């Protein structure tokens, strides 16, 4: 029977040490929020890093984690060492891909050792999921940490359907061409049968890069690549609306709801983001201050609430 295999850098559940024991807590982030409800309802398994270094746990604890995640969460953990976490995740992913794809080229680092770590970890993810792959499965790879994985899967399992979704912008060709390993990244992504982005602008940027860097032709968002066709399209990501509307009636929210309702004739602007330079948080504050300066009649009638989550810290 065919199944869906979701693969992302992080699992929807994070494993942490608590004294001599381990605790399992829900992961936070846009990817987890967007996919968790789907995973719970679908016949799927989810592979990813559980958030704890394999150097912090014993072999016995590893087996216990694997058993717990499989039985309770339908998840497969991919364990990473401290060096892999530092070089692959905090290194290449967050110091090369993240700033460049967000147009912060001056913040981008190009380190061959971190690139090698990125390749090795993508290979490690592939080796971990290989025993779970069947011919008719659908494999859904997510985000910039695993852009080489679609090609690794497709080369080993040509008949398996592979999808990829990028949760961050795909930059214009003028920016993407600055990446030293640009061709390898494109070839890794083109292992997928379907590549998804948030907006059509990102689709257009990707197609432009495949044309100008790899010499590939496309028609109606379909690329002819090697012996197959790759469809590229935009799929704006949503949320589980029913889940969040149901939360509104929870008693834990009542005090906050009542407090907001007591503020008569006041509009509230709500901003929720990670504390990251790409989110434009200082610019939002400056923009709101300028708004009040230019339209003083809105003072005490419009309020800006900022909720800022810690940025990628363990």
What are these model-derived regions, one by one?
Residues 1-314:
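Catalytic cores of carbohydrate-active enzymes across secretory and cytosolic contexts
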């Amino acid at each position: 029977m065919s199944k869906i295999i979701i693969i992302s850098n992080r699992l929807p559940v994070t494993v942490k040490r608590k004294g001599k024991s381990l605790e399992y807590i829900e992961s936070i982030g846009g990817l987890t929020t967007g996919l968790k409800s789907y995973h719970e309802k679908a016949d799927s398994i989810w592979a990813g890093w559980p958030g704890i270094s394999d150097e912090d746990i014993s072999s016995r604890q590893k087996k216990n984690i694997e058993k717990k995640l499989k039985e309770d969460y339908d998840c497969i953990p991919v364990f990473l060492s401290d060096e892999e976490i530092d070089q692959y995740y905090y290194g290449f992913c967050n110091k090369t891909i993240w700033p460049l794809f967000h147009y912060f080229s001056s913040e981008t680092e190009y380190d061959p050792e971190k690139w090698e770590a990125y390749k090795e970890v993508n290979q490690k993810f592939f080796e971990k999921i290989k025993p779970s792959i069947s011919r008719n499965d659908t494999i859904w790879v997510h985000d910039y940490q695993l852009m080489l994985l679609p090609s690794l899967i497709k080369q080993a399992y040509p008949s398996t359907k592979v999808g990829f979704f990028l949760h961050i912008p795909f930059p214009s060709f003028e920016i993407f061409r600055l990446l030293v390993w640009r061709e390898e990244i494109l070839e890794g992504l083109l292992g997928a049968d379907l590549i998804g982005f948030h907006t059509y602008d990102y689709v257009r940027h990707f197609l432009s890069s495949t044309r100008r860097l790899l010499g590939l032709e496309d028609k109606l968002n379909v690329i002819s690549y090697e012996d197959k066709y790759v469809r590229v399209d935009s799929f704006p990501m949503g949320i589980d609306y029913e889940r969040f509307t149901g939360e509104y009636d929870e008693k834990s929210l009542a005090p906050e709801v009542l407090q907001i309702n007591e503020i008569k004739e006041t509009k509230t602007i709500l901003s929720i983001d990670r504390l990251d330079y790409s989110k434009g948080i200082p610019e939002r504050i400056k923009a709101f201050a300028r708004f009040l300066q230019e339209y003083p009649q809105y003072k005490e009638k419009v309020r800006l609430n900022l909720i800022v989550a810690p940025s990628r810290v363990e």
